[in-house]
Amino acid sequence: MRCVPVFIILLLLIPSAPSADAQPKTKDDVPLASYHDNAERTLQRLWNQRHCCPIDLPCCPPG
């Protein structure tokens, strides 16, 4: 009889486990890593532009 509660808990956990097919991907889905990379790249570009020295223009990135 000790196994019954454990068995019931396991049965309850199985349907709630994440599955690879839980949300089918569409062509518009973009991985979060790509958003993170884009945000990081944008912040780096803004940082470089803000710290650009006006006297020595070659230190400024183009754009």
From Swiss-Prot:
PTM annotation: Contains 2 disulfide bonds that can be either 'C1-C3, C2-C4' or 'C1-C4, C2-C3', since these disulfide connectivities have been observed for conotoxins with cysteine framework V (for examples, see AC P0DQQ7 and AC P81755).
NADP among keywords: no
UniProt protein name: Conotoxin Vi5.1a
Subcellular localization(s) per the UniProt record: Secreted
Positions of the pro-segment in this chain: 23-50
Domain notes: The cysteine framework is V (CC-CC).
Modified residues (Proline amide): 62
GO cellular component, one term: extracellular region
Family as reported in the entry's similarity comment: Belongs to the conotoxin T superfamily.
UniProt keyword terms in alphabetical order: Amidation, Disulfide bond, Secreted, Signal, Toxin
Gene Ontology molecular-function annotations: toxin activity
Tissue and organ expression note: Expressed by the venom duct.
InterPro entries registered for this protein in UniProt: T-conotoxin
Secretion signal span: 1-22
